[in-house]
C-alpha cells in the first residue's frame, strides 16, 4: 500500500490524516533531518535511518486498545498528496483514553499556512466526540512561540510552566517547558 493509499483516519478541508506505514520512513527521515524542524526537539541534530526504523516507526505504528486506534497520524495535503508531517493524539496511559497528549511535527513547507491549527483542532474534536477523551494536554519549550500559538488556536489554555532535567540541554531549554490543556467541559462550552 503506498503512503497516499493508506485509509484515512480523519479528513479536514485541506488535510488527510492516516495511519503511518513503513513506506513513510523516507518522509519521516527527511522531516527529522531538517534542523529547523528539530530545533525544539533535539537542538537540530540529525536523525539516522536506523532511529526512524527502530524508534520512530514503532511509536507511530502502536495501536492503543483504549481508543481503538493509533496515537499518531501522517498528514498529507488533500489536494496534492504532499507529505506535511504527523499529528499526535496519544493516550498518556495505554489502558485509559481519558487524558491524551496533542502533538504535531510538520515540515517547513507547511509552516505558516494554518495546517497545524487545522489538524490539531480536528483531532481535539475527534478525541472528545469519538474516542472518550476527557482532557487534552500539550507541552513544548517555553520559547517555542509557534507551537504555543497552535495550542491556543486549538482551544487549549496555559496550565503551568515547569523545568525538566534533560540529558542534553538544547538552546532555549534554560527557559523551561510549558503545559497547556483543554478539558471536555471547556471544549463543550466553547462549541
Predicted features along the sequence, with ranges:
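Acyl-donor (CoA/ACP) binding surface of acyl/acetyltransferases
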Residues: 1-40, 76-191
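Conserved GNAT-fold acetyl-CoA-binding loop/helix
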Residues: 36-60, 70-71
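Catalytic Tyr-X3-Lys helix of short-chain dehydrogenase/reductase
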Residues: 60-61, 128
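Helix C-cap/alpha-to-beta connector motif
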Residues: 62-66
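Short, high-confidence coil segments that cap the C-terminus of an alpha-helix
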Residues: 68-70, 133
Amino acid at each position: 500500500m503506498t503512503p497516499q493509499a493508506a485509509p484515512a483516519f480523519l479528513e479536514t478541508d485541506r488535510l488527510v490524516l492516516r495511519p503511518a506505514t513503513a513506506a513513510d520512513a523516507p518522509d519521516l527521515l527527511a522531516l527529522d533531518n531538517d534542523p529547523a524542524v528539530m530545533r525544539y526537539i533535539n537542538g537540530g541534530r540529525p536523525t539516522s535511518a536506523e532511529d526512524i526504523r527502530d524508534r520512530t516507526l514503532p511509536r507511530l505504528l502502536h495501536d492503543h486498545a483504549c481508543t481503538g486506534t493509533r496515537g499518531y497520524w501522517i498528514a498529507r495535503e488533500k489536494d496534492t498528496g504532499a507529505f506535511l508531517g504527523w499529528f499526535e493524539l496519544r493516550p498518556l496511559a495505554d489502558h485509559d483514553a481519558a487524558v491524551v497528549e496533542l502533538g504535531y511535527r510538520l515540515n517547513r513547507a507547511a509552516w505558516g499556512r494554518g495546517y497545524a491549527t487545522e489538524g490539531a483542532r480536528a483531532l481535539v474534536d475527534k478525541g472528545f466526540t469519538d474516542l472518550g477523551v476527557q482532557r487534552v494536554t500539550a507541552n513544548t519549550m517555553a520559547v517555542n512561540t509557534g507551537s504555543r500559538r497552535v495550542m491556543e488556536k486549538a482551544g487549549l489554555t496555559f496550565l503551568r510552566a515547569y523545568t525538566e532535567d534533560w540529558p542534553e540541554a538544547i538552546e532555549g531549554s534554560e527557559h523551561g517547558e510549558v503545559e497547556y490543556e483543554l478539558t471536555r467541559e471547556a471544549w463543550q462550552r466553547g462549541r
